Design a protein with these regions (language model features):
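Class I Rossmann-like S-adenosyl-L-methionine
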Residues: 1-157
């Protein structure tokens, strides 16, 4: 399995690779170049899931943000944890990945990316989302998936 090592020398799991890709894109890197770079690291058997999670999270980014906000008691100021939540929620709400696998792998990804102290938060929020799934389908369905500045401008016009 070809996965990239991180600081401790262990390999990153698929969800951690997805989070790293999403963070790179959010920081202004080209999706095509980041995808090509990471596709070479991800194992052959995981490439389809990797591709689906990256593109799906990007497609649903603003909707996932709207789903996440009510689950938090205070806003997150940590892009790694926030992105882990989006990856986990996307799996739970938009794919057929088993809930226990989505949660476990996403929590492990947060640990692998240096967020061990906040991995409990990721776990708690994703578990809560599995209990309250129906209300989040409504949020996803009604979300515009447009950046707030663009949605406001379109409403104005």
């Amino acid at each position: 399995m070809r996965q990239s090592p991180h600081a401790s020398g262990k390999t990153l799991n698929l969800r951690a690779q997805v989070v790293k890709t999403l963070l790179a894109v959010q920081n202004g890197q080209s999706l095509a170049s980041v995808l090509n770079q990471h596709m070479n690291i991800v194992s052959d058997k995981d490439r389809a899931l990797y591709h689906e999670l990256v593109l799906g999270c990007l497609r649903q980014w603003h909707a996932l943000k709207q789903v996440t906000l009510p689950l938090l008691s205070v806003p997150l100021e940590n892009p790694v944890v926030e992105t882990c939540l989006y990856v986990g929620l996307y799996q739970l709400l938009c794919t057929r990945v088993a809930a226990h696998a989505a949660i476990s792998e996403t929590v492990e990804a947060s640990k692998q990316l240096g967020m061990e102290s906040l991995s409990g938060v990721v776990n708690a929020i994703l578990r809560r989302a599995t209990r309250e799934t129906e209300q989040f389908y409504d949020v996803l369905e009604n979300a515009s998936n447009l950046p707030s500045w663009l949605a406001k401008r379109l409403k104005k016009d």
